[in-house]
A protein has these predicted regions:
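Short, well-ordered beta-strand micro-motif
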Residues: 15-17, 126-128, 218-220, 249-253
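Solvent-exposed loop/turn segments at secondary-structure junctions
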Residues: 66-69, 95-99, 125-127, 141-144, ...
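Binuclear metal-dependent hydrolase catalytic cores centered on His/Asp/Glu-rich metal-binding motifs
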Residues: 101, 106-117, 129-171, 240-241
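Active-site-proximal beta-strand elements of phosphoester/diester hydrolases
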Residues: 25-35, 133-142, 164-168, 225-231
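Membrane-embedded segments
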Residues: 22-118
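N-terminal membrane-anchoring alpha-helices
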Residues: 1-22
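Active-site neighborhood of phospho(di)ester-bond hydrolases with catalytic His/Asp-centered motifs
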Residues: 31-32, 59-65, 88-95, 120-123, ...
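Conserved beta-sheet core of the metallophosphoesterase superfamily
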Residues: 170-248
Length: 253
């Protein structure tokens, strides 16, 4: 049993095999479901940011659910803004962000931008690398949003292209990337001998044929790699049983 504390998050390494030559050696960090709360201390926030920095990522990817409270979301991004990521920082919305910032998405976008992080809502960016390019896309969240990726995302006529898709929910896209990064599930949050609320039908994602059965870990689905992170916090019940908070270090080889 562990509380959802930002001091408790471990760094889980994942080797992403089969990457093209221009992606090999890249260190990227995926952080999701941070859930900063009013009672999250500055020491906890600083410890989390230091852990992110210690992983030495060139690229930071964020999976949403930063906080239920705009002021605490701003605290998180102010702290994150102290760090520098050579290839940039990109994030998507979670359902809690959509609720907290309803009608004020421009302010969230500005808050993230001031920290050097770009919010992707059904959009993508291309990052040039030596010998190829990395495309990072992000979809709107599924509960309140309208998911439809832009045409640029699907344009794969460039040579030497690797695509990473950020989605808060583990709902499989029709146009599948090389790697998909998701959160939301908190790894089940309660795991008793392999039994989680999701195994009991707690929540369903989208159309059945597109919903991933995975609630945590790295998986291969028809050639697409899918990582569902356990994330760090929780929005209401601040407790985890059998599920350790994590941030995810991606090592491409």
């Amino acid at each position: 049993m562990s509380r959802c504390g930002h001091l408790d998050a471990t760094v889980t390494e994942h080797r992403i095999g089969g990457a093209p030559a221009f992606m090999r050696g890249l260190r990227a960090l995926f952080v999701t479901d941070v859930h900063i709360l009013p009672n999250t201390t500055q020491a906890e926030l600083d410890a989390l940011v230091e852990r992110i920095a210690a992983a030495s990522p060139r690229l930071l990817l964020l999976g949403g659910d930063y906080s239920d409270f705009p002021k605490d979301c701003e605290r998180f991004f102010r702290a994150l803004g102290r760090l520098d990521f050579p290839l940039g920082a990109y994030g998507v919305l979670g359902n809690n962000d959509a609720e907290a910032w309803e009608g004020h998405l421009k302010l969230l976008r500005k808050t993230m931008s001031q920290a050097g992080c770009k919010l992707l809502v059904n959009a993508s960016v291309d990052i040039p690398l030596a010998g190829g390019r990395l495309r990072v896309g992000g979809v709107d969240e599924y509960r309140y949003g309208n998911v439809h990726m832009n045409q640029r995302w699907s344009d794969v006529h460039f040579g030497n292209l690797y695509r990473i898709l950020l989605s808060h929910y583990p709902v499989l896209p029709e146009d599948r990337p090389d790697l998909m990064l998701c959160g939301h599930t908190h790894g089940g949050q309660f795991n008793l001998l392999g039994l989680t609320p999701y195994a009991l039908g707690f929540e369903r994602f989208g159309k059945p044929h597109r919903a991933s059965a995975a609630i945590s870990g790295l998986h291969d689905i028809g050639g697409m790699k899918l990582l569902v992170s356990k994330g760090i916090g929780a929005s209401r019940l601040q407790l985890r049983v059998g599920v350790r908070p994590e941030i995810n270090l991606l090592l491409f080889d």
